[in-house]
From Swiss-Prot:
Gene3D superfamilies: Amidase signature (AS) domain. It comes from Anaeromyxobacter sp. (strain K). InterPro entries: Amidase, Amidase_CS, Amidase_dom, AS_sf, GatA. GO terms for cellular component: glutamyl-tRNA(Gln) amidotransferase complex. GO terms for biological process: translation. HAMAP family: GatA. Keywords: ATP-binding, Ligase, Nucleotide-binding, Protein biosynthesis. The active site is at 84 (charge relay system), 159 (charge relay system), 183 (acyl-ester intermediate). This is Glutamyl-tRNA(Gln) amidotransferase subunit A. Belongs to the amidase family. GatA subfamily. It holds the Pfam family Amidase.
Length: 492
């Protein structure tokens, strides 16, 4: 008797892969369940910008043939996943959530897409996002907003909103997102899933539509810590096509997963719990810290004194890099072109005016101003100096602890439309996550409960030393094992 499609969709990534390996279920069954789930729910969620049903079915048939021959490529072989629409996919539209890339069909795959497919994972589609990954609510998508599965009137977070919503709603078993200032961890916290921003350079950025090149990093989202660890192990590693890619060997993140929290030193930054947090979020975070103490970890008071300057530094550095990266969208080489323009100069201006949304335009203006003659030293250079101070703060804190723990966001998921009229309020959603990117450190969001008042998920942020993702997974798994899984969100 076959397993109902809804039950297949709620299987963990490794659980689904094990079922295919044991021939208890087929990849084709998993993919059909995923496609049916997307068809049934995405009209309300808006998590997908494109679904590649025919390609997914063909990949599933190939995975089933490999399983029949006993030639499975990995634990991911035959399992449905999806990727943020910021990764180029050969022959499949890639928009980065922007009208200026509407209709663009890349001639190649991003490295992370290649690695997923080489492992046998079945990519069923491309996920909704804020335009060029600029946003914290997914409301900056040029195509449609994405909704939180826990409450359709609320944001799933951004910019990887579709990546988090699709996993939380059971449309796919895992997804990929990007994180420039919190864009994996914030949606993961809002949607009650696990989200990982690896160390800068741990995962190749080749084939990722660039926002801020010194901050962007690729990472997984999944419903279980171990599943996220498996996906990261699959996509991590050196890539000669990315000059920022590290040659450091990739750890086996699954090996220490069940080692528990005993003996860990958990740093708690006093600046992160000294105000500005909603009461329900603070209560859940403090309860998670108490859980670590009960499990045998030692809580250590640490200080990150320059973290208060993180937002200011980030919103000088990131827009400066974005203004350079987005200069390539000129209507000449690819993407939208103002064909009715009279002359080259007008074509440049009109193509960008019609193709770019309000938030990219705002950040291009900010970045161009920060880099302009007479202001470079006063703004951009000073922001880079603050970045160095933030990195030194973390270095000093890690002298006395193994991981740093605190909130991911100041609040639970907020209402759609609540902050769109106030960009500064929107930017403050990333106040606890941005410093991790500025310091190039690995960070992770793991569910730590539901806020009592709203019943919405709260995430705990864990930050580690460079390239020590293994300790983050160990610490996150200890909490996950003790607290148990969150309930599934309501049916859309």
């Amino acid at each position: 008797m076959s397993t109902p499609a809804k039950e297949l969709c709620r299987l963990g990534l490794r659980e689904a892969g094990a079922g295919v390996a044991a021939k208890a279920i087929s990849s084709s069954e998993l993919v059909e369940a995923s496609l049916a789930r997307i068809q049934a729910t995405d009209g309300k969620l808006g998590a997908f910008l494109a679904v590649s049903a025919d390609r997914a079915r063909a990949a599933a048939r190939a995975a089933d043939a490999r399983a029949a021959r006993g030639e499975r490529r990995s634990e991911l072989d035959g399992v449905p996943v999806a990727v943020k629409d910021i990764f180029v996919t050969k022959g499949v539209p890639t928009t980065a959530g922007s009208r200026i890339l509407e209709g663009y069909l890349p001639p190649y795959d991003a490295t992370v897409v290649e690695r997923l497919e080489a492992a046998g994972a079945v990519i069923v589609g491309k996920l909704n996002m804020d335009e060029f990954a600029m946003g914290s609510s997914n409301e900056n998508s040029a195509y449609k907003p994405c909704h939180n599965p826990w409450d359709l009137s609320r944001t799933p977070g951004g910019s990887s909103g579709g990546s988090a919503a699709s996993v939380a709603a059971g449309q796919v078993h895992a997804s990929l997102g990007t994180d420039t200032g919190g864009s994996i961890r914030e949606p993961a916290a809002f949607c009650g899933v696990v989200g990982v921003k690896p160390t800068y350079g741990r995962v190749s950025r080749y084939g990722v539509v660039a926002f801020a090149s010194s901050l962007d990093q690729v990472g997984p989202l999944a419903r279980e810590v171990g599943d996220a660890a498996l996906v990261l192990r699959t996509i991590a590693g050196h890539d000669p096509r990315d000059m920022t890619s590290s040659t450091r060997p990739v750890d086996d993140y699954l090996a220490p997963l069940e080692d528990g929290a005993r003996g860990l030193r958990v740093g708690v930054p006093r600046e992160w719990l000294s105000g500005g947090l909603d009461a329900g979020v603070e209560a859940a975070v403090r309860a998670a810290l108490d859980t670590y103490r009960r499990l045998g970890a030692t809580l250590v008071d640490v200080s990150l004194p320059h973290s208060k300057y993180g937002i200011g530094a980030y919103y000088l550095i990131a827009p400066a890099e974005a203004s350079s990266n987005l200069a390539r969208y000129d209507g000449v080489r690819f993407g939208l072109r103002a064909a009715d323009a009279k002359g080259l100069k007008e074509m440049y201006a009109e193509s960008r005016e019609r193709g770019l949304g309000a938030e990219p335009k705002r950040r291009i203006m900010l970045g161009t101003y920060a880099l302009s003659s007479g202001y470079y030293d006063a703004y951009y250079l000073r922001a880079q100096k603050v970045r160095t101070l933030i990195r030194r703060d973390f270095d000093e804190a890690f002298r006395g602890c193994d991981v740093i723990a605190g909130p991911v966001t100041p609040s639970v998921a907020f209402k759609l439309g609540e902050r769109t009229g106030d960009p500064l309020q929107m930017y403050l959603a990333d106040i606890f996550t941005i410093t991790c990117n500025l310091a190039a450190l690995p960070g992770l969001s793991v569910p730590c409960g539901l806020e009592a008042a709203s019943g919405l998920p709260v995430g705990l942020q864990l930050v580690g030393r460079p390239f020590d993702e293994a300790t983050l997974f160990r610490a996150a798994r200890a909490l996950e094992r003790e607290l148990g899984p969150l309930p599934a969100p309501p049916e859309p």
